[in-house]
């Protein structure tokens, strides 16, 4: 289980994002909490590119634009930074994924939109940045138990969403495959995460769309 102090620190940290600020505070400029939110976005980039173990505290202070003292005031250690970063990344990516699959009429179309969500992030510059969850999952055996729990939770959460899309498609008849939704979701997730890995090697969007086309045959 996660260290209680880490959980409490993260909840307190994230709750600051929604706190209202007085006109005087807004007039003085952007509050510190929002600077820390931006700092976590910097941490997402460096952890995604370098991985947990290869990222030093110096890398984090540079990416987050924080002095080392400020970093340790906000977070207990590098592990706490990573856990907070992973949680922020998971929340943001879930919202973006759900938005990407919304608005389509059938489960099949929503499933394809989910695959395209990954294809569009697996080429060019954004592809070379990598995916925080995929990178951490690949390094899971070398991570400690607290971090492994966070990574596993992120992977399983995405798998549940994909399984829901499969089930919706089977219900409306657009997904003709009779495979168990959970099994098909795992296969699709392997394709999605695989695109993020291959995308780090400099592939084109056309390459990734071809993967989507093949993956969707599993649903036919």
List PLM regions with ranges:
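Hydrophobic alpha-helical connector segments
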Residues: 84, 98-129, 181-188
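Helix-turn-helix
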Residues: 38, 42-80, 84
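Amphipathic alpha-helical segments used for helix-helix packing
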Residues: 110, 124-146
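Amphipathic C-terminal alpha-helical segment
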Residues: 121-124, 164, 168, 188-206, ...
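Hydrophobic alpha-helical segments that form the core
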Residues: 17, 129, 134, 178-198, ...
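Amphipathic alpha-helical packing segments from all-alpha helical-bundle domains
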Residues: 91-94, 109-113, 145-171, 182-183
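N-terminal intrinsically disordered/low-complexity leader segments
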Residues: 1-34
């Amino acid at each position: 289980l996660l260290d209680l102090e880490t959980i409490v620190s993260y909840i307190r940290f994230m709750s600051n994002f929604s706190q209202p600020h007085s006109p005087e505070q807004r007039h003085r400029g952007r509050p510190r909490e929002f600077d820390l939110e931006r700092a976590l976005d910097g941490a997402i980039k460096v952890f995604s590119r370098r991985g947990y173990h290869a990222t030093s505290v110096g890398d984090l202070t540079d990416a987050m634009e924080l002095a080392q003292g400020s970093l340790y005031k906000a977070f207990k250690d590098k592990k706490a930074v990573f856990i907070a970063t992973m949680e922020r990344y998971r929340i943001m990516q879930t919202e973006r994924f759900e938005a990407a699959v919304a608005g389509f009429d059938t489960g099949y179309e929503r499933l394809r939109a989910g695959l395209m969500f990954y294809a569009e992030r697996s080429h060019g510059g954004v592809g070379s940045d990598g995916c925080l969850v995929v990178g951490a999952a690949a390094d899971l055996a070398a991570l400690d138990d607290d971090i492994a729990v966070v990574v596993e939770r992120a992977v399983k959460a995405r798998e549940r969403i994909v399984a829901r899309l499969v089930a919706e498609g089977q219900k409306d008849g657009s997904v003709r495959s009779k495979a168990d939704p959970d099994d098909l979701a795992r296969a699709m997730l392997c394709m999605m995460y695989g695109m993020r890995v291959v995308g780090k090697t400099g592939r084109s969007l056309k390459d990734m769309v071809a993967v989507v086309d093949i993956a969707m045959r599993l649903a036919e």
